[in-house]
């Protein structure tokens, strides 16, 4: 979730990284492997560790197109009822919060089997 200005800035940096030649998954891994809060400095350090210029990111993060991208993402999240991370969408179900991998896999398998993340006799047709 976006909790502070520093969190907004980290999201802006993530947008810029996603638009760069850097592998976004590498950025994500570096960012969430760091200790402490995900904030401006953590995002800048993660991007810089992948070869992006800290100065360029700081100069570009306030650009109107970055603000527009952030607003679009926020609008979509609001429309889907997402207020935090992580949130999973499986089928038409919104599942907030972290899930153990086994639970996530089971819910996906259930969706494939019965059309719901939790199968019941009626969901399975009998």
Which role fits each region the language model picked out?
Residues 1-48, 83, 114, 118-126:
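Structural alpha/beta surface segment adjacent to cysteine/selenocysteine redox centers
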């Amino acid at each position: 979730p976006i909790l502070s200005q520093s969190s907004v800035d980290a999201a802006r940096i993530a947008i810029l990284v996603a638009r760069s030649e850097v592998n976004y998954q590498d950025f994500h891994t570096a960012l969430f492997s760091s200790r402490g809060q995900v904030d401006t400095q953590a995002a800048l350090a993660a991007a810089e560790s992948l070869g992006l210029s800290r100065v360029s990111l700081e100069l570009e993060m306030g650009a109107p197109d970055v603000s527009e991208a952030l607003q679009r993402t926020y609008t979509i999240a609001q429309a889907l009822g997402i207020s935090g991370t992580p949130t999973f969408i499986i089928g038409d179900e919104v599942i907030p919060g972290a899930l153990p991998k086994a639970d996530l896999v089971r819910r996906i398998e259930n969706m494939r089997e019965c059309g719901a993340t939790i199968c019941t006799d009626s969901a399975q047709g009998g």
